[in-house]
Regions:
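Ordered, amphipathic secondary-structure segments that act as subunit-interaction surfaces
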Residues: 24-34
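Helix-start/capping segments and mature chain N-termini
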Residues: 1-17, 21, 35, 41-187
Length: 187
């Protein structure tokens, strides 16, 4: 694992400097990446470095009145037997990319990936939540999802406003019975 030598305030300050230097006039996704480089390849013990990549993300599809079309992907979500899915590392997103490209090639807007047990996991780069009979339901961390600050915030806000929430395994058949399905993520 990599331990950050940077404090949260140092990272925040660096992000602000990068944003000011680039003068964006649209929504921006900020990728903060920690890495180790140098001789020794995988076993390198050189200092941890950081780079910040601001990526313009214009929101042309913000009008969601008619909804979006999702599909159950043929790509299984990675699991702890191969790579820890809870880790926010670049390599873990390749699995989601394949699922997304498959969905796009079949004229769907997004994939829904299942875990090793055939239970609902997540979409590509987004956690999945559903409303069913007034209850907000989302798969647990053990369903091969990326642990998400946004997902946790939505669960906390739902509880704060006295909405019933359930974090539990979700069968794919339940998606067809849901009142609403939505994706959540930071970018």
């Amino acid at each position: 694992s990599i331990t950050s030598p940077y404090t949260p305030s140092e990272i925040t300050e660096a992000i602000i400097k990068v944003l000011h230097a680039n003068t964006f006039r649209c929504d921006v996704s900020i990728r903060v990446t920690l890495f180790v480089d140098g001789e020794g390849g995988w076993s390198s013990s050189n200092p941890v470095n950081m780079f910040i990549a601001p990526i313009a993300k214009p929101r042309s599809d913000i009008n969601l009145e008619n909804g979006k079309k999702g599909m159950i992907s043929s790509f299984e979500r990675i699991n702890d037997h191969s790579m820890p899915p809870r880790a926010k590392v670049g390599a873990n997103y390749i699995n989601s990319r394949y699922a997304y490209l498959e969905a796009q090639s079949l004229s769907f807007d997004f994939p829904i990936m299942l875990d090793r047990m055939g239970k609902v996991s997540e979409s590509s780069g987004s956690c999945l939540m559903m409303l069913r009979d007034g209850v907000l339901v989302t798969p647990p961390n053990t369903a091969s999802i990326v642990e998400s600050i946004t997902r946790n915030t939505l669960l906390e806000l739902s509880k704060k406003f006295n909405h019933t929430t359930e974090v539990r395994s979700v069968d794919k058949a339940e998606l067809y019975l849901a009142d609403e399905i939505f994706l959540c993520g930071t970018s």
